[in-house]
Amino acid sequence: MAPTIRKSHPLLKIINGSFIDLPTPANISAWWNFGSLLGVCLIAQIATGLFLAMHYTADTSLAFSSVAHICRDVNNGWLLRNLHANGASFFFICIYFHIGRGLYYGSYLYKETWNIGVILLFLVMATAFVGYVLPWGQMSFWGATVITNLLSAAPYIGPDLVQWIWGGFSVDNSTLTRFFTFHFILPFIIAAASMIHLLFLHQTGSSNPTGLNSNLDKVSFHPYFSYKDLLGFVIMLGALASLSTFAPNLLGDPDNFTPANPLVTPPHIKPEWYFLFAYAILRSIPNKLGGVLALLLSIMVLFLMPIIHTSKLRSLMFRPIAKTFFWALIANTAILTWIGGQPVEDPFITIGQIASGLYFLIFVLLIPSLGLLENKLLKI
């Protein structure tokens, strides 16, 4: 019998091994849907972004009016812009669920896959940050000024580094031009890194909710999980379309409807909601360099996860004490997100400092010690 083309063709057999005949644990839940949802988000962002880039002008005197032109004069431009802006929010919702799933079910024990995933998170955050600057509204300008200024905290090279990134002595035309360049190229770098992420994942296969070896119980990815993922796509794209059409500015900042003005500072400078937890950690330390290091460590702490895993059990499914503290971490991150959007005054300063301390305490101290405690209690 002649071999099936999808199994013999050099290109098709890669696709076949990744999306069709891929052996997948039969018991993976909807939490395993977010990886493919992130792929859909990336494709949607690149597609909408490409059309927006055709009409956008990366110049300080024209950027704001070019975005207004897209929304007013370009056919369905308002929809493209709203899908792109809200698509970023959905991207981060999916990425945070995806990381949460990885932490809960011990997916970080696939070290290479996990580490590339954390690098991907940094890349997505960088892309979102430079993208937020492009409409050249008040929050775009002042957000760029505040965040890039943090690099001046780096000893010795700091001030030169900031001027090098700005391309001058302040956030200006050259900054906007290079930020647009970065915003255009980074999604393609993310796409390439995602392929490496998948390559390493397929070396080991997916984990499953129990954290046990699933070689005894695997099914082909298609049709079982391709259709299950398709349901997730419909739900997410439906929610994105609803948000983008009925409440497109719900997650945005009203200050960004005012053109950038270097002479007027907005009353509260804050990033988009998905960066607020890290922003709260940054603000909770009164020292500039300390704040910047805490900001970096709030994400880099994820690199430690494979090292500080001390439990003999992989998943939190069978670890009731650790499970409690996992949900405490989620609640704590939600509190940090809320604090990041509040003004810098009491009691918000104190709450932010306590929540920031707890964030690192749970990661660095409680996760490894609870693993050892549970091993002792289970006598393993």
UniProtKB/Swiss-Prot annotation:
Keywords: Electron transport, Heme, Iron, Membrane, Metal-binding, Mitochondrion, Mitochondrion inner membrane, Respiratory chain, Transmembrane, Transmembrane helix, Transport, Ubiquinone. It comes from the Eukaryota. This is Cytochrome b. A ubiquinone binds at residue 202. CDD domains: cytochrome_b_C, Cytochrome_b_N. GO terms for molecular function: metal ion binding; ubiquinol-cytochrome-c reductase activity. The chain crosses the membrane at residues 34-54, 78-99, 114-134, 179-199, 227-247, 289-309, 321-341, 348-368. Heme b b566 binds at residues 98, 197. Its cofactor is heme b. One of its GO terms (biological process) is mitochondrial electron transport, ubiquinol to cytochrome c. One of its GO terms (cellular component) is respiratory chain complex III. It holds the Pfam family Cytochrome_B. Its main location: mitochondrion. The lineage of its organism: Eukaryota, Metazoa, Chordata, Craniata, Vertebrata. SUPFAM superfamilies: a domain/subunit of cytochrome bc1 complex (Ubiquinol-cytochrome c reductase), Transmembrane di-heme cytochromes. Component of the ubiquinol-cytochrome c reductase complex (complex III or cytochrome b-c1 complex) that is part of the mitochondrial respiratory chain. The b-c1 complex mediates electron transfer from ubiquinol to cytochrome c. Contributes to the generation of a proton gradient across the mitochondrial membrane that is then used for ATP synthesis. It is a multi-pass membrane protein. It comes from Pelophylax nigromaculatus (Black-spotted frog). It is found in: Mitochondrion inner membrane. The cytochrome bc1 complex contains 3 respiratory subunits (MT-CYB, CYC1 and UQCRFS1), 2 core proteins (UQCRC1 and UQCRC2) and probably 6 low-molecular weight proteins.
